[in-house]
């Protein structure tokens, strides 16, 4: 069996292959509510043939949105808006669906990327962001408000409430977003966390709130459904969060029942210098997997099927997550299966698209006409 198309079980959820559609912000919600765009976007990705589809970073409270148009899950209206989207996916695709729960922290109140992505001032319709410390993301920006005890409690409760709503929606798995410079990553990184209480200073203290959030989500989500965490393995800035910190964090997550680590990098500082190349973040996933012994997801410029299969076969990671490559080619898993001689699930409406030279691509299928 081809490694990339071999099954893998996380808790009570078995995935048919190792391909994950990464969570990708769409900036297309209204008041946090999913729209027709989400029906189209998630619907066509659900037919991709991937093993797991992860819904974009979903804010647990309005102030935790990156932009005005981020998806949210904080009240009955945001929950209800996702129901028809998920119902359509379940009706037409066998894919498992995860959701990434997130809080933007000091990177909140931003423009959409195609509008420039900059901070929106309160006077221009934005809002004051909250963060571990009153340290802005960029020099010259309005500093965020440092979270006090009441704020920490509010956010902790918001993650728990969102996890319960996700469970009611039938979400198969949750990924807690602790990467890319958003709130939980801000707590982890000494570049953003300047607190002097039990949530700042030492690495142990900086890990405390993210670990509390994980425990809260794990307790609120059904025991038979997995919960993982996305991390930035390094800040790519001297004096920031590094791989050895990520490994220590992963050990603590494993002790608390974490089911996977999705290993990305960067995002907490505009000073980062990232050496981009195919698979440039795979060594981080490999290091975490070998040091901690828990399932890992590799991500970042893994665009070729042979490359993806090779790293799974070598044990460098257990899954590969794809974002931009999947947007460019929403049938990437089909094409990968064809190239590697594997099989992939396709809806019967699309069976006739199976190339003649790949007669077993969609498995044991048959159709006819008068």
Model-derived features with residue positions:
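Flavin-dependent oxidoreductase catalytic cores
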Residues: 1-370
